[in-house]
Amino acid sequence: FLSCFKTLDEFEEEEATWIIPGWIPEGQITLMAADGGVGKTTVWCNLISAVSNGVSCILDPPGYTRKPEKVGFLTTEDSVRKKLKKKLRLAGANLKNIISPDFLKDEDGQLRDMKFGSDKMKQFISNFRLVLCVFDPVQGFVPPDINMGSRNAMRDCMAPLISLGEEYRTTFLVVCHTNKRKGAYGRD
């Protein structure tokens, strides 16, 4: 345990690199939070399309270029077959560079165990070596024993993504919904 600590002069200093310049740093966790129905899925589909196809996205500065990369998304909210494939295709995505689980093939329910910090999550990231991976929404990937209202529990839950990001250079975009309860602040 104590061997994990060192003085700052022993750390190699690195410049930040960006998947989306000024917005989404490479190998780190970025959160996207907003009310339902404002276009979170449209934004992340645009980002995935751009990265998969090597073109600029809506958040890029003018003239920004990139090379096509492998990306992935995990969603427990929208159907890949009924909504997301079409949305990505219409956004100009390179569908061969996008990985997503096929829940119809998951006859024994193994995909339900793919949570933050799980061996299955590490296996997914290490096998596909994605540049960008989207989780929509965060609730679908938090283990059931974690209290999402506890900041410390959520930090511990998501900490393995930091290690995976640095080891495999995968950037994580985690989509969060604001309170959907009717009558919550700003809803009416």
Which residue stretches match the model-derived regions?
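Phosphate-binding/switch region of NTP-binding enzymes
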Residues: L31-M32, G37, T41-T42, Y64-R66, ...
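Conserved inter-motif catalytic segment of the P-loop NTP-binding fold
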Residues: E13-E15, I20, G36, P62-D156, ...
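Pre-Walker A (Motif I) flank of P-loop NTPase domains
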Residues: E26-T30, E69
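Post-Walker A helix-loop "phosphate-sensing" segment adjacent to the P-loop in P-loop NTPases
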Residues: A50-P68
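N-terminal pre-Walker A segment at the start of P-loop NTPase domains
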Residues: F1-I19
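Hydrophobic positions on the alpha1 helix immediately C-terminal to the Walker A/P-loop
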Residues: V43, L47
